[in-house]
Amino acid sequence: MKMANSLRGEVLKLYKNLLYLGRDYPKGADYFKKRLKNIFLKNKDVKNPEKIKELIAQGEFVMKELEALYFLRKYRAMKQRYYSDTNKTN
């Protein structure tokens, strides 16, 4: 029972982190929130601890991908701001 509670906490933490990251999703926060909720509800009946750990790892991978997407978008915007002016003057 102790393991199930710790996994439950990890799942909730993952959900909250993904929900937070979804605020800046390109298709909109509402779109991301609906998809996230559907995915978590689809897997709510999984009881096998190994399968739960696998799903958590998958969710953490998605988190890292989202972070990379956001960093790349910010980098591109910043690069465009700074380097677009120098190209126009030359």
Curated annotation (Swiss-Prot):
CDD domains: Complex1_LYR_ETFRF1_LYRM5. This is Electron transfer flavoprotein regulatory factor 1. InterPro entries: Complex1_LYR_dom, Complex1_LYR_ETFRF1_LYRM5, ETFRF1. It is found in: Mitochondrion. The keyword Protein biosynthesis does not apply. GO terms for cellular component: mitochondrion. Keywords: Mitochondrion.
